[in-house]
Amino acid sequence: MSTTENRGQFGSKLGFILSAAGSAVGLGNIWKFPGKACSRGEVHGRNLLAQSAAFLLVYIIMVALIGTTVMMAEFTVGRNAHKNALGSFRAISQKWGFAGGIGVLTGFIILCYYCQVGGWTMKYIYAYIAEAKMVYADPTAYFLGMLGANGFPLQGAVIFPLIFLFLTAFILSHGTAGIEKMSKVLMPLLFVLLIGLMIRSCTLPGADAGLKYMLNVDFSTINSNAILVALGQAFFSLSLGMGIMVTYASYLSDEDNLISNTGIVCVLDTLVALFAGFMIIPAVFATGIDPGMGGGFAFATLAGVFEAIPGGTLFGLLFYFLLFFAAVTSSTSIMEGTIAFLIEEKGLKRNHALLGTSVVVFIIGVFYTLSQVYMNIKGIWVSKNGIEYPIFGDFLEYLTDRLLLPLGALFSVICVGWVWSPEKSVEEATSHGRFKFSLAPVYKFMVKIVDPIAIGVIIIAGLVFGMSIS
């Protein structure tokens, strides 16, 4: 086992847990999870995807069975080698470094559009401070204007994403110490804002219908599609398949308890998703706003919700701060995977790696936003319907969500389960017997048999049926 000499290292268990939870808690927890929890059933006469409480239970089961075991596998790989994602898998077998390489590539591509959306959260913070009336006049038009409907989207594609990217790089310029300090500040603030907004939403007139929808279990609404969606959401929500958890665990000492750390991170991530559901769905019921869950939901749809509630401008401002905190804690972790790779595999200094990565991420990201409305930029995708030409932004999401993310995770669990062996993974998780792991037999079975099958199903659902796991 290599040492952590000359590498960053988390200074405390709390610092690692908050950093890993910050990575897992992203934009998808706050706006995509409530949308999927509200995707069948009926709100104001609108057919949705599954009765919410039943979906929540299925989601929690998927996190407990699939999410925790895949995360544990990634943690053990990273801590075993104390290297970047590619180097950690290569330490298991020279032939399997590509499993980590896929994760690094996936994270880099996601970072390109994640920093753009992070910039949008900053734009909306500014909007709610300086021009809330313009947002309320027509929330959809304001959102589309930010994307270029009224001319080149200087603020939406360049200025605010550039500020967000600079902030991400600045935090990472201080290494693991920067990540840890940021997480210790932003994660508690995120929970305070989330709980406060959840309480406000649940006390709105008419919110009781949303609460009933969230809490009334009807298993007859659960079908194979809902199970697949819950599985995909649980997988994506925990930042698996990007090499992030491998990289973060590589900054742990051999005395850290990976078993308890895995459980705590998964619980915190799930709590954020559940709290977000109780924050958004009751408000949707209370205001009668159409809960369309497309890409503009957090910006166009929820702006309409805030307009309709007392004190909406204040709560809207707090909500976009919440989104910003979630975005920046995730963007730093995603970028760190790339930076660690460039430092250790290519010999770059940290600041040089940050500069080069930021430039490329920014350029690609600009085209992501421009393709939404302003320019007709397309990619190419092959599906069961033949060759398609989605807009460039959708192409990037298809590439990561439907192919690279689950593919990287699949190779990761195959490597742990069949090349390295679950027994060695358990030995690493317990710090060579220092910690007790009573569920070790279950973990071994999951990582060797169940996890590869489940992830394979996600890949088939994405490539054949077009299901996006995020």
Residue ranges and their predicted role:
Residues 2-3, 40-46, 118-151, 251-255, ...:
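Helix-loop-helix connectors at the membrane interface of multi-pass transporters/channels
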Residues 12-60, 249, 259-263, 267-268, ...:
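Transmembrane helix-boundary motif of multi-pass solute transporters/channels
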Residues 15, 157-158, 268-274, 313-316, ...:
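Loop-to-transmembrane helix boundary motifs in multi-pass membrane proteins
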Residues 13, 18-20, 58-94, 115, ...:
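Juxtamembrane transmembrane-helix boundary signature
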Residues 1-32, 70-75, 79-91, 97-98, ...:
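Membrane-interface "cap" regions at the ends of multi-pass membrane proteins
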Residues 4-7, 35-50, 80-102, 115-177, ...:
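Inter-helical loop and helix-membrane interface segments of multi-pass membrane transporters/permeases
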Residues 102, 346-358, 397-455:
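C-terminal membrane-solvent junction of multi-pass transporters and transport-like membrane proteins
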Residues 2-10, 14, 180, 184-328, ...:
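Membrane-embedded translocation segments of transport machinery
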